[in-house]
C-alpha cells in the first residue's frame, strides 16, 4: 500500500472554494490561502444565527498504545462515509503541533484513504495559528518581565511618574506566565532568566509546549472575538507582593495579545480525500491541556451540516472526559452520540499479560514481562484486554451518551478474534459495534459504521456532567479520581492543598478541573495497564487558568514540555530533488 504521504500527494483535490460552497459558505466568508486552505470568517455565525443545528458526534478511544488506534482515521473515515450515504457531514479536528510531528506520534491528519489533504500542509504550519498563539503568549511573558525590570529599577514613585502606569508591585517569585515554543525540548523545562548585567531581576522560569498554553485553550473555548478578548484580559500572569492576582488587563498587554490572534480565531477549512469538508482549529493536547478542537468550529459546522464529527485526544478518560466537563460545560452543545475506537492490538497491549516495548516512549511497558508478537492471535490476551474496552464503554455511557464501538481493522487481524470482539461488545452497554476499513477503503470502508452512528444519534441522549460547578475543588478531584478513573481516592501534596485553599479564597473554586496526567493508563501510572484497581491519584499542583475557565491539576510526573525520544520523527523528514517534503507521516 502507498504511504500516507504518497496518497496525499497523488490525490485529486477540489478548489477549496468549491468545498466551502458545497458546505454552504459564501465567497466573502472564505479568506483563501492558495487553492487548498481557507480561513472561515466568523460573520457566517451572524448570517446563520437562527439556523437549525445538526448533530454532534464525539470520537474517543480505548487507552492508547504505541501501535496507534486510528481515532483520527475513524473520524475522517466516518465523515466521508456519512457524506457517502447522503448525510451532509463535516469534520472538526485540532491542528497538529510540530512537537509530536518531529517527535514520536507523527502527524494528525488521519491516514491511508481517510485523511485530510494536503497532509503536509496540515501537519506543518497550516495557516499559522500555532505561531500566533506562541507569539501572543511570549509577548505576555516579555511584558511581565519588562514591567518587573522597570519597577525594580525605578521604584514606585519614579516608575509611576515616568511611565504614567500604576505600580503593580510584582513578586518575582510568583510570576505564573512562562514562555512557550512549538517543539519538544526537555532542556527548557527549568530555566533562569534575567542573567547578566542590566537584563532584569533574575527569577526561575520555564518553557511549555505551545499546545499547553492557556491561550491555546482560550482559542478553543472562545465563542467569538469579543469573548476571546475578555478571556485574554483575565489571564493571571503573576501575583503581587500581597498575593493579589495581576492580569493581562492590569499589565495593559491583553489588547496586543488579542491583536496577534485576530486571524487565529477563524477556523481553517480543508478537505478529505473524498472532498468532505474539515474545519481545523486550535490544538490543545489532551494529556496536559483539554484536548479538543474549538467551540467556534463546531458552531459553524453545526449550522451548515447534518452531522459534525469531532474527536477528543487519547482515551475516554482524557479528551472525552474534558470534552464533557470542560468544553460542553462552556459551549452548551452536548453530543448526540459517541464513537469509541479500538483495535485488536490495543486490547492485547492493554491486557497486562504482555506488553510491547517501544524505545521511543519511556515507561510504557510493564517491567519483567517479555514482549510478544502483538499481531499473533491470542485469545487469552484479547479477553483480558477487553476489560479495558468495557471500562471505556461504561465511562462514556455514564455521561448519558449512546456509544458505538468502531473496530479499526488491520490487515493482520484474525477473523475469529474480530467476531469474538463484536459479540462481546454487543453484550455490553454499547449501542452497537462495527468494523471500520476506512484506512484501506476510504468512504466505502465505514458505511456500516456511519449507518449505525446515524441510528444512535436518533435516540434521545441524556447528557449529564460528572460534577456540578458548586462542588469544592477537593470534591471535584475526588469525583474525577474515584468515578472518572476508578481510584480509591486522591491525595493532594501540601502545595496542592494550599493552592486549593488559595484558589477558593480568590473566587475560583467554581471552575471545572483539567487533569494533566499520563494518557497511557486509566490511572496516573503508565505501567498500570488494563483496568487498574486499588490506586490513589496523587495531585502535586493546581494551576489556575482564569481566562480559559478551568484549573489544571498536575498528576504524577506529567510534564507540560515533552522531550524528544531516542528515534525522533525528524530523522525521516527531508526535501527531495523536486522540492517535495518526504518522510512525513
Swiss-Prot record:
Keywords: ATP-binding, Ligase, Nucleotide-binding, One-carbon metabolism. SUPFAM superfamilies: P-loop containing nucleoside triphosphate hydrolases (SSF52540). One of its GO terms (biological process) is tetrahydrofolate interconversion. Pathway: One-carbon metabolism; tetrahydrofolate interconversion. It is an enzyme of class 6 (ligase). InterPro entries: Formate_THF_ligase (IPR000559), Formate_THF_ligase_CS (IPR020628), P-loop_NTPase (IPR027417). It catalyses: (6S)-5,6,7,8-tetrahydrofolate + formate + ATP = (6R)-10-formyltetrahydrofolate + ADP + phosphate. Belongs to the formate--tetrahydrofolate ligase family. This is Formate--tetrahydrofolate ligase.
Amino acid at each position: 500500500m502507498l504511504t500516507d504521504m504518497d496518497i496525499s500527494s497523488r490525490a485529486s483535490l477540489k478548489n477549496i472554494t468549491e468545498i466551502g460552497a458545497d458546505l454552504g459558505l459564501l465567497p466573502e466568508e472564505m479568506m483563501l490561502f492558495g487553492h487548498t486552505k481557507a480561513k472561515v470568517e466568523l460573520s457566517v455565525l451572524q448570517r446563520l444565527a437562527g439556523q437549525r443545528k445538526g448533530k454532534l458526534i464525539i470520537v474517543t478511544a480505548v487507552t492508547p498504545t504505541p501501535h496507534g488506534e486510528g481515532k483520527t482515521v475513524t473520524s475522517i473515515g466516518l465523515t466521508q462515509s456519512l457524506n457517502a450515504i447522503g448525510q451532509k457531514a463535516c469534520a472538526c479536528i485540532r491542528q497538529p503541533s510540530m512537537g509530536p510531528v518531529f517527535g514520536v506520534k507523527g502527524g494528525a491528519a488521519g491516514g491511508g484513504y481517510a485523511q485530510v489533504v494536503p497532509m503536509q500542509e496540515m501537519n506543518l504550519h497550516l495557516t499559522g495559528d500555532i505561531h500566533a498563539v506562541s507569539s501572543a503568549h511570549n509577548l505576555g511573558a516579555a511584558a511581565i518581565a519588562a514591567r518587573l525590570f522597570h519597577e525594580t529599577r525605578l521604584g514606585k514613585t519614579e516608575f509611576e511618574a515616568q511611565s504614567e502606569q500604576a505600580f503593580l508591585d510584582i513578586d518575582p517569585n510568583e510570576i505564573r506566565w512562562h514562555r512557550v515554543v512549538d517543539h519538544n525540548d526537555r532542556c527548557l523545562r527549568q530555566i533562569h532568566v534575567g542573567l547578566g548585567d542590566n537584563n532584569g531581576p533574575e527569577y526561575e522560569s520555564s518553557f511549555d509546549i505551545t499546545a499547553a498554553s492557556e491561550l491555546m485553550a482560550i482559542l478553543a473555548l472562545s465563542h467569538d472575538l469579543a469573548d476571546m478578548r475578555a478571556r485574554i484580559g483575565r489571564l493571571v500572569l503573576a501575583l503581587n507582593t500581597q498575593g493579589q492576582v495581576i492580569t493581562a488587563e492590569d499589565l495593559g498587554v491583553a489588547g496586543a495579545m488579542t491583536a496577534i490572534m485576530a486571524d487565529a480565531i477563524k477556523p481553517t477549512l480543508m478537505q478529505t480525500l473524498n472532498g468532505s469538508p474539515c474545519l481545523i482549529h486550535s490544538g490543545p493536547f489532551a494529556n496536559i491541556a483539554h484536548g479538543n478542537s474549538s467551540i467556534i468550529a463546531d458552531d459553524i459546522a453545526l449550522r451548515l451540516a447534518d452531522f459534525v464529527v469531532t474527536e477528543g485526544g487519547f482515551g475516554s478518560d482524557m479528551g472525552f472526559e474534558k470534552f464533557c466537563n470542560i468544553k460542553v460545560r462552556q459551549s452548551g452543545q452536548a453530543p448526540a452520540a459517541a464513537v469509541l475506537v479500538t483495535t485488536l492490538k490495543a486490547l492485547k497491549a492493554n491486557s497486562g499479560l504482555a506488553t510491547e516495548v517501544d524505545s521511543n516512549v519511556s515507561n510504557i511497558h510493564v517491567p519483567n514481562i517479555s514482549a510478544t508478537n502483538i499481531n499473533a492471535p491470542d485469545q487469552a490476551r484479547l479477553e483480558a484486554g477487553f476489560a479495558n474496552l468495557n471500562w471505556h464503554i461504561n465511562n462514556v455511557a455514564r455521561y448519558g451518551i449512546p456509544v458505538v464501538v468502531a473496530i479499526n481493522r488491520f490487515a493482520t487481524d484474525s477473523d475469529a478474534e474480530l467476531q469474538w470482539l463484536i459479540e462481546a461488545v454487543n453484550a455490553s452497554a454499547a449501542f452497537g459495534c462495527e468494523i471500520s476499513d476506512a484506512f484501506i477503503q476510504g468512504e466505502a470502508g465505514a458505511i456500516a459504521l456511519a449507518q449505525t452512528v446515524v441510528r444512535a444519534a436518533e435516540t434521545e441522549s441524556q447528557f449529564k456532567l460528572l460534577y456540578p460547578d458548586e462542588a469544592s475543588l477537593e470534591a471535584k478531584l475526588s469525583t474525577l479520581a474515584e468515578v472518572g478513573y476508578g481510584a480509591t481516592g486522591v491525595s493532594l501534596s501540601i502545595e496542592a492543598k494550599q493552592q486549593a485553599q488559595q484558589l477558593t479564597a480568590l473566587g475560583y473554586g467554581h471552575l471545572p478541573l483539567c487533569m494533566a496526567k499520563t494518557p497511557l493508563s486509566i490511572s496516573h501510572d503508565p505501567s498500570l495497564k488494563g483496568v487498574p484497581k486499588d490506586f490513589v491519584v496523587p495531585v502535586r499542583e493546581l494551576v489556575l487558568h482564569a481566562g480559559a475557565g478551568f484549573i489544571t491539576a498536575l498528576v504524577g510526573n506529567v510534564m507540560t514540555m515533552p522531550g524528544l525520544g531516542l528515534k525522533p520523527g525528524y530523522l525521516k523528514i527531508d526535501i527531495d530533488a523536486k522540492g517535495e517534503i518526504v518522510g512525513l507521516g
